[in-house]
Amino acid sequence: MGGALPPEIVDYMYRNGAFLLFLGFPQASEFGIDYKSWKTGEKFMGLKMIPPGVHFVYCSIKSAPRIGFFHNFKAGEILVKKWNTESETFEDEEVPTDQISEKKRQLKNMDSSLAPYPYENYRSWYGLTDFITADTVERIHPILGRITSQAELVSLETEFMENAEKEHKDSHFRNRVDRENPVRTRFTDQHGLPIMKIREGYEIRFQDIPPLTVSQNRVGIEYSDRLYRLLRALGGDWKQLLAEMQIAFVCFLQGQVFEGFEQWKRIIHLMSCCPNSLGSEKELFMSFIRVLFFQLKECPTDFFVDIVSRDNFLTTTLSMLFANVRDSAHAGDDLKKKTAQFKQYLTNQFKWDFNCD
């Protein structure tokens, strides 16, 4: 950690790195940032020497699900969170501008209670998140500021009633059950079960990408129009599409949020079904392959065995991408070469068989 770095680097990062004060967090609980997590000790009060940029902080107590947040740390910033033992979650604690200098002076007395950022994992973390910006975090992060693997669910019926109560303060709305309104609106699926959704404010605000069906999972499918609509929704910035792919991957890998995995798959599937875009969006596809290569390279082995390889999703989907690039007259030699190298790496590393015919 910090002690393994040259003293001058440690001194520089202490002066220019960010600080996270995580006050009141229970002892012997899980606390992590990016690629590293620990069991907290009795004196734990947070982290020091955090390199500027986007990081993912997460924690859990006992057998509770992980909760976390993304934050774009600035040089010298002091971010304060306070643990609420009653609600078992963290809350923001604002530091008034006129108290920042005093808070920085207090850090010296807290030094032994602050864990240094795990720099041995920083290169891997940066490689997983290099497209993610402060704008990405602001756009995607849940409004209530917490990412959780077990987000609070609410039925559409309950949500409808709650919204109606807000709009009609006298509570006399059509979903009230009384003599005048003996029946209320029901929201059920085809099996008669309540339709559930994540409560407003808790959802990760991913871009809407229609999933492809099994019948659409074949070479020759062309969905460049969907890709262009998605890019327009992102202000024409293809880097933000890759940023969303990266943030979705981290949400699943470190946040243990299954919807992150689903969004990651949807992006890969879409990118594999756009042969007409290979020439005009070559830079996007070149970077896409690099991002996916690094994600698969850094992924724990059990992640693949338990999740990615379960339904052969990647072999089936990437077979379409490899065939589209191979057969394209517009992809260009550099994209074809990079794709062929990626395919060979996957074949050698994971023994995957790509049927591109």
From Swiss-Prot:
Please name the GO terms of the biological process aspect recorded for this protein, alphabetically: spliceosomal tri-snRNP complex assembly
Q: Which Pfam families does the UniProt record give?
A: AAR2 (PF05282), AAR2_1st (PF20981)
Q: Which domain of life is it from?
A: Eukaryota
Of which family is this protein a member? Belongs to the AAR2 family.
Q: Identify this protein by name.
A: Protein AAR2 homolog
Tell me what organism the protein belongs to.
Answer: Caenorhabditis elegans
Q: What is the phylogenetic placement of the source species in the record? A: Eukaryota, Metazoa, Ecdysozoa, Nematoda, Chromadorea
